[in-house]
């Protein structure tokens, strides 16, 4: 076994990128297996900060393959722009590899996403980047894949077949303007020409890597609670950020996975609409939001803030089979007199320990908290677990106990040197 999956285990924005970086330091490949450029991740490489949404985190690490798997939906324009941006920061992208089976986000996906969200009375807070419509076309078997994009003849044939229906939706259903075939064709054929050198059968490539016992890191976007099957449906993304998404989104088997690392923050945040049982609407939320810089990488929207939710996290442990835990942003809680962890819910007088499937349950849900003493010390220069204030140590230990998952690391700031390991990343 040579594969490690790094899974966001809340509602995204947990700091997965820097944990991926730890594994990537001694890995041969880093693979993004789902999502699109709707999910931003911030990583540090030396003193350089990278805000990525289309490229895998491993792109900044020399010597590793940075792979976009078949489960990713790709906006060629955004991807090429991000390539140009990282190159301007001194990164070369010859290690980038794109699956020929990945689906392409087309202009009509973005137009339909924007029109649908604007017209809906029940908005789910989409980033309006065409992710959902692209996945819809994939499931409906009317999508355009990267293999099609890099073949102008096939691409033109498919675009000519699909565009009239998409234009009918835009004009007749939403009253929007129709899109022009020639404009799309010319632009996307050029995108295909530029991306073609990076395209291959990534499932075959990964199979060869793992046969040779190479170390491979699988990087999820978003988080478990946004999974289309296991998240707070319908307020979810359109793919599977859970560990199970790797099998379909990268084309590898479960026997090839050694560990599943769940990444969380020491509190909870969420962007967009949907249930959030531990959400705060007070000065504590404002404190955490400002100290933690809780604004979306892509959307720049202020994130919703709440206490850590062990009920939701136990759900993440169950559906992704977490074997290790990486806890980020512990420093953000410094200065609070007390910190809380949700340990169960009460619904209609009954205590429950599972995360509800029905959105209606959350309207009558009470949250049961365990309160622990906080700490005042600045911990951003701490380098070892036993250097933390005893209350911070106890907080981390309690999280591990409640989830029954061993702690891999804790972070006291955003930079790589502020993340500290309690055990080796590769065992």
UniProtKB/Swiss-Prot annotation:
Protein name, per record: Adenylosuccinate synthetase
PROSITE patterns found in the cross-reference section: ADENYLOSUCCIN_SYN_1, ADENYLOSUCCIN_SYN_2
UniProt: GTP binding residues: 12-18, 40-42, 303, 329-331, 411-413
Active site: 13 (proton acceptor), 41 (proton donor)
Catalytic reactions on record: IMP + L-aspartate + GTP = N(6)-(1,2-dicarboxyethyl)-AMP + GDP + phosphate + 2 H(+)
GO cellular component terms attached to this protein's record: cytoplasm
HAMAP family named in the record: Adenylosucc_synth
Binding sites annotated in the UniProt record for substrate: 297-303
Complex formation: Homodimer.
Record-linked NCBIfam families: PRK01117.1, purA
Function, in words: Plays an important role in the de novo pathway of purine nucleotide biosynthesis. Catalyzes the first committed step in the biosynthesis of AMP from IMP.
InterPro entries, per database record: Adenylosuccin_syn_GTP-bd, Adenylosuccin_syn_Lys_AS, Adenylosuccinate_synth_dom1, Adenylosuccinate_synth_dom2, Adenylosuccinate_synth_dom3, Adenylosuccinate_synthetase, P-loop_NTPase
Species whose genome carries this gene: Leuconostoc mesenteroides subsp. mesenteroides (strain ATCC 8293 / DSM 20343 / BCRC 11652 / CCM 1803 / JCM 6124 / NCDO 523 / NBRC 100496 / NCIMB 8023 / NCTC 12954 / NRRL B-1118 / 37Y)
Gene that specifies this protein: purA
CC cofactor: Mg(2+)
Pathway listed: Purine metabolism; AMP biosynthesis via de novo pathway; AMP from IMP: step 1/2
